């Protein structure tokens, strides 16, 4: 009879708890601080304006075998809230959720159409037709805080799914404008690169 070493129940095992604690400890050591003008660390929990495509849709790993199954994924939004921060930009984040959902629905419809035309599975079309991430909404108002955080996310997998275009290797038009807006209107601005690949920030 074969021996199974994986968990056999839905309970969180002691091994998982131990490994989760280790991952939490190591995560900070795996992040790189590229530049700091005294903004970090933030003085303490308080009101923050948080923008960017990675706030709620945080990238935890690449696609394909670069992605692993986990019980939970803590987004940057969740992490900030659990740390006691009050996020003032829920309306903007909701707006981006809709933009992303609409783009994903259009992508799935296009995949289905091409799969039918070519008489191949939808999965096969995905290898040649990577999802084009939509640009973010424009930021037009300053929130009642001196601190803004912008989370720029990019994801990719094992195939030819990166392109030298806006909202991919390059920043989108609104991404560039939004980051410039935050730098101009907030005393403290933090840019987080939540990326599983290269991105041109020049």
Name what the model sees in each region:
Residues 1-202:
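C-terminal non-catalytic regions of proteins with extracellular/luminal or membrane-system context
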